[in-house]
Design a protein with these regions (language model features):
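Active-site cleft segment of glycoside hydrolase catalytic domains centered on the general acid/base Glu
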Residues: 87-92
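Short, hydrophobic/aromatic alpha-helical segments in well-folded domains
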Residues: 97-100, 128
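A broad detector of the eukaryotic-type serine/threonine protein kinase catalytic domain
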Residues: 82-84, 148
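Outer-membrane beta-barrel pore domains
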Residues: 10-12, 22, 34-36, 111-259
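Outer membrane beta-barrel
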Residues: 1-82, 93-95, 102-110, 164-166, ...
Length: 259
């Protein structure tokens, strides 16, 4: 909070049609919602999959192939150094990897399967994600599930779900459209994979919770160019849960512009 970080800095080349390679600092190709850029998000506050459980940016190398004929699909994969955004001086014996496949049976449907392995410190973490969405001129309906497991049972497995619906209503004056949104997402107790400095074991960084979000988005131009987002978030914790100040019931107003 109150800090500015450079999130993406990469070079991308297209050696042949439908194939590209990227090297630099970028968002790791994993999941649907966590792989969205900030201007592509539907809600003012990201889902638990995108913000806590599956959010990874790193320095590395990726390749992406797109097939447009027959059964269209997009296949991405990459290797990463595992040090995150600002700590790339250390040498590592283990490379992190991520693989993501998007199946596009027609223009309205997207089925995404992805897997990722990271090793933040001494514990190997494997993640598996499956998501699907349907989209037409008015509706976007999406559901996603992420499963996260820790090596040597260093921490109990994590489950996370994100589901939402968005309906667009075109407008003729002032705003281009108004969008009505509703979301349900949840996560179980989560650890970022870094051991406690005193006990040496993994600790809970994010306590289990459920959340219901409702909101509207006013678009001043085409979608995801200039949006005014207004959301209300209702959280549900277990009695043992300790919510962070920023992870409680709240109203969020956000103005997003892309230039």
């Amino acid at each position: 909070e109150g800090s500015i970080k450079m999130l993406d800095a990469y070079a991308r080349v297209f050696p042949v049609k439908d194939l590209n390679f990227t090297i630099g600092q970028m968002r790791v190709p994993f999941t649907i919602d966590a792989h969205r850029s900030p201007h592509q998000q539907y809600f003012a506050n990201r889902s638990f999959i995108a913000k806590q459980v599956g959010n990874v940016r790193d320095v590395g190398f990726t390749g992406c192939y797109t097939q447009k004929e027959g059964l269209p699909f997009i296949l991405e994969g990459g290797l990463f150094n595992g040090s995150g955004l600002t700590n790339q001086k250390e040498w590592h014996k283990t490379l992190n990897y991520s693989i993501k496949a998007q199946l596009l049976p027609n223009k309205n449907w997207n089925l995404t399967l992805s897997t990722q392995m990271i090793k933040p410190e001494h514990t190997r973490i494997n993640m598996y994600d499956a998501g699907i969405y349907y989209q037409n001129n008015r509706f976007h309906i999406e559901a996603e599930y992420l499963y996260k497991m820790y090596g040597h049972e260093a921490f109990k497995d994590v489950h996370a779900v994100n589901s939402f619906v968005n309906y667009d209503l075109p407008l003729k004056k002032v705003f281009n459209k108004i969008s009505f949104l509703a979301r349900y997402d949840m996560m179980t107790d989560h650890s970022n994979g870094l051991a406690d400095s005193e006990t040496g074991v993994l600790k809970i960084n994010d306590y289990a919770r459920h959340r219901v979000t409702g909101g509207i988005t006013l678009s001043l131009s085409k979608a995801f160019i200039a949006d005014l987002r207004l959301n209300f978030e209702k959280y549900f914790y277990q009695k043992s849960g300790v919510p962070k100040e920023s992870e409680r019931d709240k109203i969020v107003i956000e103005f997003m512009t892309r230039f």
